[in-house]
Amino acid sequence: MRLPFVSKTASVLICIITLGYLVILGHTILSPLFFAFLMAVLFTPFANLLERKLRFPRGLSTIFSFLLLVICLVGVFYFFITQSQHFADDLPKLRIQIMDVVERGYLSITQEMNIELSQQMDFLQKGLDKLLGSSGEILGFTLSIFSSTGLFLIYSMLFFIFILNYRRLLYKFAIDVFDEKHRPKVEKIIMKIQKIIKQYIIGLLLQFILVGGIVSAFLFVLGIKYALFFGILTGLLNVIPYLGITFSGGMTIVFAWATNGVDLSIVVMIGYVVIHIIDANIILPFVVGSKVKINALFSFLGLIIGEKMWGISGMFFSIPFLAILKIIFENIDGLEAWGQIIGYEISPRKQKKKYQITKNIVLEELD
């Protein structure tokens, strides 16, 4: 018996609202659990390699995978923290430079338009003291990307170990919990999710390296101080669509304006716009692929809802969660339309983008 469209839609919406409410209540546990799930899927091929090729027992392969993950995370955080510390040490000097530049600008305006300067400068001074005096909060935002407490990392590492060690048991449970007739489709969905998650995370890592490298090189050529710091920050925050590069670009433009003048800050702004266009139209399609692409409407909604539910970590997790949801909807009878509306409209006649790098190397857009 097929349910009427209104009943089916109402059922889906009720399930989504109920699930969303439960997710909000359990964000302290579910946020690190979801992060650990993503990392476990990424490290599963490495663990399988250790077990099949090197004959490692399950526990030992899990430990080696865990150590590799810790080394990667510690390396990234150590590098970023040291760079952030150098930047934080110069914030008082930056405040003085900003005040000097603004004062000269206001002075010229005052002379031309006879506007009282003292009250404006007092207001600006208080604003800068509040903004730059809270450097700990600024760095806390960039360094505490996933959570404001250390419990997130502790929970994540524990969940990562358990999920990776019991991955076959969890996989068997996910299959056996359904009726026999549905198991082939469930297995197909799980395999697709694994493939898409690995493709997405590896693509994000490549995107982080490419965008961070391009921005660092661009700022270094312009002579901007802390070019590497701003490049890494841009690559890291670029994981958050639209908002990430806007935030990091705004910081870089303000810094360039305060230290190098208006002309160079305009060049930096134009450069960020060009880099974003390159990232959206060349880097993202080739390193991530269209199957993970979520349209702008649902990306923005996902960012807003994710931030309201889980804070900053929710903004990071919103896109992979929507990608998983999209795959599930596309493979369930009657819910295909929900999966289609989340993604892009795909034209059957549209050809994949190709770029001839060399005679033997061709860069082709991923599915």
Language model features with spans:
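Hydrophobic alpha-helical transmembrane segments
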Residues: R2-Y21, L30-F34, L60-L67, Q85-I109, F141-L158, L205-I209, G212-L219, ...
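Hydrophobic alpha-helical transmembrane segments of membrane transport and translocation systems
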Residues: S265-D367
